[in-house]
Amino acid sequence: MAPVHVLCCVSVLLATFYLTPTESAGSLVSYTPNSCCYGFQQHPPPVQILKEWYPTSPACPKPGVILLTKRGRQICADPSKNWVRQLMQRLPAIA
């Protein structure tokens, strides 16, 4: 049986990857339009912290929008929500 600290580290890593938008190729840090969202932010973040956005890949199981903050954080949002569409109009899109 593996030591408890190893199991804890593995659990933390798995949770981190599950909650981060996934990339179909490349680094998690790069902002390529190949990411998928498996859960969505329920409430709008303050527009002051946001920088830009890009859509998820059409190959993803759910359509989504990834909002990028000025600090580099990625937030998954549901493009069918009114607040998300309003942010998409206000913020520049990544081509």
From Swiss-Prot:
User: Would the keyword Signal be found if you checked this record's keyword annotation?
Assistant: yes
Sorted UniProt keywords: Signal
One GO cellular component term: extracellular space
Query: Matching Pfam families, A to Z?
Result: IL8
Answer yes or no on keyword Signal: yes
Renumbered to this chain, the signal peptide range is 1-24
Q: Name one GO biological process term.
A: antimicrobial humoral immune response mediated by antimicrobial peptide
- Tell me the GO molecular function terms: CCR chemokine receptor binding; chemokine activity
What is this protein's name?
Protein K6
Organism in which the protein naturally occurs: Human herpesvirus 8 type P (isolate GK18) (HHV-8)
